[in-house]
């Protein structure tokens, strides 16, 4: 882990929290849009949410677990309310008008609450697993293990809370199938695309940090 000033950590906390919030909001909207791939039911949210695990793993690797946990706790409450508002306004992918906020939508509220619980569970587990394995000489070990464990807890918790006995008949009937397929796609996408992306971004960020450290050292000298 590198040494950072308090100002750098505050900036990282702000921008990474904003990134997490944007991914959560978009995923909560996209999870309302089911798709079928090779006969298996899943949602578009399977393709957006892995970005959070990529960001969290890079945060733990570069800034350390404490900052990653601060981001999780900073994002949880805002994500709950903003996700409900956005998902109500764009219910089932269609603009409902601002009057949609004047009445309570149980379907959307369950999605927002499920996202709140699943995000906290999945991210805390992701940070814990990654932090335990981050010193392993195999660079891919920590992100792979944290992705597998974090995603399974996040996905199953989310779909159970959001769609078990849901008023949406399709999701109520297929939530378990969709959850398992969603998890499989998340893992596949993460291992095929996000794991290599993690390696590339990690090397790029570490190189930039090393270059900045050298410049700072020269200026100090």
Residues covered by each model-derived region:
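Juxtamembrane helix-boundary/capping and inter-helix hinge elements in multi-pass membrane proteins
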Residues: 61, 65-67, 134-140, 166-171
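Short helix-perturbing small/polar motifs within transmembrane alpha-helices
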Residues: 10-28, 56, 91, 95-144, ...
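Membrane-embedded alpha-helical bundles of multi-pass transporters/translocases
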Residues: 71, 76-79, 91-118, 168-221
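Hydrophobic transmembrane alpha-helices
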Residues: 1-73, 80
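Alpha-helical transmembrane segments and their lipid-water interface positions
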Residues: 31, 82-86, 126-130, 155-162, ...
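Membrane-interface alpha-helices at helix entry/exit sites of multi-pass transporters
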Residues: 66-74, 141-148
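The feature identifies polytopic integral membrane transport proteins across all domains of life
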Residues: 139-147, 174-179
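Alpha-helical transmembrane spans of integral membrane proteins, capturing the lipid-embedded, hydrophobic core
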Residues: 17, 21, 25, 50, ...
């Amino acid at each position: 882990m590198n040494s950072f000033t308090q100002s750098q950590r505050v900036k990282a906390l702000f921008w990474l929290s904003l990134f997490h919030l944007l991914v959560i909001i978009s995923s909560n909207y996209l999870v309302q849009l089911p798709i079928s791939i090779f006969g298996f039911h899943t949602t578009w949210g399977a393709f957006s949410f892995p970005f959070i695990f990529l960001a969290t793993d890079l945060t733990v690797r570069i800034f350390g677990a404490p900052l990653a946990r601060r981001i999780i706790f900073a994002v949880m409450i805002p994500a709950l309310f903003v996700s409900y508002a956005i998902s109500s306004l764009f219910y089932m992918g269609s603009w409902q008008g601002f009057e949609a906020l004047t009445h309570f939508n149980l379907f959307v509220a369950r999605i927002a609450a499920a996202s709140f619980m699943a995000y906290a569970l999945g991210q805390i587990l992701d940070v814990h697993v990654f932090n335990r394995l981050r010193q392993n000489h195999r660079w891919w070990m920590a992100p792979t293990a944290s992705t597998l464990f974090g995603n399974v807890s996040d996905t199953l918790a989310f779909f159970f809370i959001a769609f078990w006995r849901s008023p949406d008949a399709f999701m109520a009937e297929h939530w378990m199938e969709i959850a398992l397929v969603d998890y499989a796609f998340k893992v596949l996408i993460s291992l095929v695309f996000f794991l290599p992306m993690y390696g590339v971004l990690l090397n790029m960020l570490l190189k930039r940090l090393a270059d900045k450290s050298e410049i700072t050292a020269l200026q100090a000298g």
